[in-house]
């Protein structure tokens, strides 16, 4: 199991074998192993890795970083692994752990669009545009008065749109630039430019 944390840089294209491949560029790492969790101590196997230097940390976290022998880090994420013994505290993780052609799963956070109506959020058709209609962008009926006299849970209604955790499975690494810590991944990646992304070896690859 390989993993790394990065930030989305943007999209471009790469020419390979006379084909144009749309790619997303991710600036990933370097990351450091901050903590190891085992079944004996925590009930499950995982490692915690850190990314990006932090300016200020509280005393308890300062102790955690000191124990791992790394500088204070801003972003900490946990990844489940089968054998935490394969990793050492303070170990550096860079993009060279991956190779071109590897299949990876990428997790990001979709663009937040705020409070949105049913037409934008769910793609509802809306009401009639003319002939005396006044419900142009409303969602329509949400239930009945007498039975069941309530709105069912999960009903598609207006609300917060976007800013959700999204995972893209089996993306392919097209190119790796070890010197600049860059990974070019085939296709799109969730989130805005500069958004945080988590990369791991594909589970179903």
UniProtKB/Swiss-Prot annotation:
GO molecular function (one): structural constituent of ribosome
Domain of life the protein comes from: Bacteria
Keyword RNA-binding among UniProt keywords: yes
Keywords tagged on the record: Ribonucleoprotein, Ribosomal protein, RNA-binding, rRNA-binding
A UniProt-annotated Pfam family: Ribosomal_L3
GO BP of this protein: translation
A GO cellular component annotation in the UniProt record: cytosolic large ribosomal subunit
Record carries keyword Ribosomal protein: yes
InterPro entries from the UniProt entry: Ribosomal_uL3, Ribosomal_uL3_bac/org-type, Ribosomal_uL3_CS, Transl_B-barrel_sf
Assembly information from the UniProt record: Part of the 50S ribosomal subunit. Forms a cluster with proteins L14 and L19.
Role according to the record: One of the primary rRNA binding proteins, it binds directly near the 3'-end of the 23S rRNA, where it nucleates assembly of the 50S subunit.
NCBIfam families cross-referenced by the UniProt entry: L3_bact
Protein family according to the UniProt entry: Belongs to the universal ribosomal protein uL3 family.
Protein name in UniProt: Large ribosomal subunit protein uL3
Native organism: Thermosipho africanus (strain TCF52B)
